[in-house]
């Protein structure tokens, strides 16, 4: 919310607290300010768990069963009590999955009464070749549901990034959302600020839901999601300095540190592939044969042995993955580098998950010699390796192996899989 204020976007009064005492003190400061400026009127507060996930209001905290990551409080003391129930606990919502997200901070904000809720987003649109404004006079709930039930209420306005957002088009868009009079001017100020933020901070998405009209005539951004282009990290140091790694998938954090293209998924078959296209095709063929990938991992063409080891470490630590499909088409990426990385990982980190290995291309035969040389070496006894040259057969084999390992785990049995 602070970054929005820097662009003259109106938001509720707020403070972020890391302890229950700090939250209570911030609420007291709010109350003192409001009483002094509102003729003695008391104020209510809203406490929101700060986790990177939606659905907080309907979530629950795993450790104490406390219901709701968004709570209305009537006094600073209640703010402190509620914050204590949230901080340090794991909030589970529909978007977090059963693992949940740890709440390290809470947002304390004023409570206000909403007259109308709107939806506004700015995205990069491929078909428009630039930014596009998307809005609806119906906000406050899932935009997907709104688009399904009331498609006519969704308004889109492409923006020429070279010309920017003109005042005329800005007022036209705000009018489509149902703003008029003084509120139209206030809405234009917010939307203009959102666009300037989008451009100047290298955003790929800004979603505001809701943008509200309050009973006292204000227009406020109440909740927002912002995505920033990772490629702009070098010039948006202030933004990326706020990155909270505790809210991210630890697998993706480790991959980022090793300069690997990795996206964690929920399946049981770990994937290590070179090239994004082949990686997606590998995931597709796993699905085709009834399996489910545990990740997207593109080691690219320039990965070295160290990166291969780091990639396998990530898969080794992933409890979801019970086998690995390594699918390499050697061009710039040499097959022997993959083989040496696999061998080193077996020795250094005791990599012991079954590996279905498919290698084609540059130095394929050299890779086979590397693997043949360690076949009877007890130092590599943990390595469960199955080699298959055919892409389709390799995928089928990986799905079968994952199924066997899963069944064995459910029966509390240990299995060791190796080639005949």
What are the functions of these language-model segments?
Residues 352-360:
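Short internal beta-strands
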Residues 333:
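Short glycine-rich, flexible loops that bind phosphorylated cofactors or substrates
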Residues 329-330:
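A generic structural motif
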